[in-house]
UniProtKB/Swiss-Prot annotation:
Gene: cbbL2
UniProt-recorded Gene Ontology molecular function terms: magnesium ion binding; monooxygenase activity; ribulose-bisphosphate carboxylase activity
Species whose genome carries this gene: Nitrobacter hamburgensis (strain DSM 10229 / NCIMB 13809 / X14)
Enzyme category, top tier: lyase
Functional description taken from the UniProt entry: RuBisCO catalyzes two reactions: the carboxylation of D-ribulose 1,5-bisphosphate, the primary event in carbon dioxide fixation, as well as the oxidative fragmentation of the pentose substrate. Both reactions occur simultaneously and in competition at the same active site.
Binding site for substrate: 128, 178, 182, 299, 331, 383
Keyword tags: Calvin cycle, Carbon dioxide fixation, Lyase, Magnesium, Metal-binding, Monooxygenase, Oxidoreductase, Plasmid
Subunit structure as annotated in this protein's UniProt entry: Heterohexadecamer of 8 large chains and 8 small chains.
Top-level taxonomy: Bacteria, Pseudomonadati, Pseudomonadota, Alphaproteobacteria, Hyphomicrobiales
Entry-linked Pfam families: RuBisCO_large, RuBisCO_large_N
Residue numbers carrying N6-carboxylysine: 206
Descriptive protein name: Ribulose bisphosphate carboxylase large chain 2
Amino acid sequence: MNVLNEKSLTVRGKDRYKSGVMSYKKMGYWEPDYTPKDTDIICLFRVTPQDGVDPIEAAAAVAGESSTATWTVVWTDRLTAAEKYRAKCYRVDPVPGAEGQYFAYIAYDLDLFEPGSISNLTASVIGNVFGFKPLKALRLEDMRLPVAYVKTFKGPPTGIVVERERLDKFGRPLLGATVKPKLGLSGRNYGRVVYEALKGGLDFTKDDENINSQPFMHWRERFLYCMEAVNRAQAATGEIKGSYLNVTAATMEDMYERAEFAKELGSVVVMIDLVIGYTAIQSMSNWARKNDMILHLHRAGHSTYTRQRNHGVSFRVISKWMRLAGVDHIHAGTVVGKLEGDPLTTRGYYDICREEHNPMQLEHGIFFDQNWASLNKMMPVASGGIHAGQMHQLIQHLGEDVVLQFGGGTIGHPMGIQAGATANRVALEAMILARNEGRDYVSEGPDILAKAAASCTPLKQALEVWKDVTFNYQSTDAPDYVTTPAVA
């Protein structure tokens, strides 16, 4: 790994505080000899300097502008513990295969951050600095969050273990479906979709991100019909069922009102969108914890800043923030579906959601060891362009602690919604049985599905309708240090 080496140029003593403009390197934001403390928050930025800008100066500027610096020397620095509070860029590496881009490692003292506040954390590390003129682009790739900081957060209110206990469902992925079309259905027809899907074998149905309270269906009407459907499906199947009721609204007062009504109706889960903001997410997490509710997060809007390789915030960082903030479910990609998702990078997202400790794995895009202390695990959700014919691939790539959501793959079934749900449930049960028997379910997957379909007409129809459907596009966000193998 080629590391840019340049000794510290920090000006010390009275010359450091002379009025005027001084380079960020000289102000102390470049410290190549610094060894990060166990309690430091470390950020890895992908820095793309403007032409002619020294990459180390650009990296030092990121450290300065995301901590204590401004554009000129200020004498009030002498009233603070400036040496302590300055963020320190201690390493700059060229990004492999990306000319003009650099990885900058920056350490922040823990005292720079308010305990237990995602809003405060993000105001520093992705605040003003992303608009800094000397940079063409800037991306926050990863973070190391010290245990001392992690433990100031409450984390997911329910967690994977307790959720499975409440549902009494173990040893397999959970199955869901997003109601389609996402907009335009009446409350009565919406409830009918929920009932058919749950009766057919799904564990959950879900509101989509932009179904809130529109003229064609107000939120209270939707909640009533959905919960009637859930209760009827539970009575018909003898299984615990749920529907993610989206309580996203214009104000916190409205969201609390909707969540309380969902609880009164007996719902086990409520849903929010990422676009409500970090403070609102933490507030809803506190509500869910107090009311023993599962909290589902739709990552609506994330691609506006996670999609581009050289600018924005990586979804692995968003995943870390959401585990701190405290959500139980988070959409994390499918690998084989219609949405962006490099296989190795997606594996890294899932590891962040589900593991107690994440070791550094550059092949998964994870640059730091991360200890999650005692925080609950999040259940990742795979949604977007998946169908029963991909079941062996989904289990291979995503494991069993995941919600597999077949929206179009349920509701678009030629025999109807209930048949679509049954097709997915039978495909899943057949694949899990093969796995538990020790068979090579990945290579034998198509044969396993074909054999199950011989005695299940809905699955046979699903395999026929979607047999040629794939979404094989080049990912825009793949690991920098390895080449991702093709999806089988």
